[in-house]
UniProtKB/Swiss-Prot annotation:
Stretches for region Disordered: 95-156
Entry keywords, A to Z: Ribonucleoprotein, Ribosomal protein, RNA-binding, rRNA-binding
Transmembrane segments: none
Gene behind the chain: rpsF
Entry keyword Isomerase: no
One Pfam family here: Ribosomal_S6
Protein name: Small ribosomal subunit protein bS6
Role summary: Binds together with bS18 to 16S ribosomal RNA.
Family the UniProt entry places it in: Belongs to the bacterial ribosomal protein bS6 family.
Lineage per the UniProt record: Bacteria, Pseudomonadati, Pseudomonadota, Gammaproteobacteria, Chromatiales
SUPFAM superfamilies cross-referenced by the UniProt entry: Ribosomal protein S6
Biased composition regions of type Basic and acidic residues, renumbered to the chain: 117-126
GO BP, one annotated term: translation
Species name: Nitrosococcus oceani (strain ATCC 19707 / BCRC 17464 / JCM 30415 / NCIMB 11848 / C-107)
Molecular function GO terms recorded: small ribosomal subunit rRNA binding; structural constituent of ribosome
PANTHER family listed in its UniProt record: MITOCHONDRIAL 28S RIBOSOMAL PROTEIN S6 (PTHR21011), SMALL RIBOSOMAL SUBUNIT PROTEIN BS6M (PTHR21011:SF1)
């Protein structure tokens, strides 16, 4: 049997039926002797781009061990279920059982980023990295600008 990582997105209005869908998918996997190593419900999250005019979806991650025939059956179940917006199946070399970084971020109550940065993208100076005149280039430009300004004053 092979190891797979499966992520699928469920329509946000169908979140109540998620447990029934999970039972159906679990039954498909376990019928052929497969097993689920990790099952994480990431909840309702913002989408990176709209899908069918929706901006949020319910995310579910599964790491499973099953036969390729079972994966075909599972993907066809996703395809014929209108509540599943997207699915992705990736073949893995080994079973992944530890908690995903996204689920760890949910457990700690944060967004999963480094708290030492405190959510800032820039350094403490607050600037965009511009420290004044650039050596060589800006000196020449500033000299040209002052020469041009002096010429315009003389012509007036």
């Amino acid at each position: 049997m092979r190891h797979y990582e499966v992520v699928f997105l469920v329509h946000p209005d169908q979140s109540e039926q998620l447990s029934a869908m999970m039972d159906r998918y679990r039954q498909i996997i376990e019928t052929d002797g497969g097993c689920i190593h990790r099952l994480e419900d990431w909840g309702r999250r913002q989408l990176a781009y709209p899908i069918q005019k929706l901006y949020k979806a319910h995310y579910v991650l599964m790491n499973i061990e099953c036969t390729p025939r079972t994966i075909e059956e599972l993907t066809s179940a996703f395809r014929f279920n209108d509540a599943v917006l997207r699915d992705m199946v990736i073949r893995r070399e080994e079973a992944i059982t530890e908690t995903s970084p996204l689920a760890k971020g949910e457990e700690s109550g944060g967004r999963g980023y480094d708290s030492a940065r405190s959510g800032r993208d820039r350094d403490e100076s607050g600037g965009r990295g511009y420290d004044g005149a650039r050596p060589g280039r800006d000196e020449d430009e500033s000299k040209e600008n002052t020469d041009r300004d002096e010429q315009s004053e003389d012509s007036e």
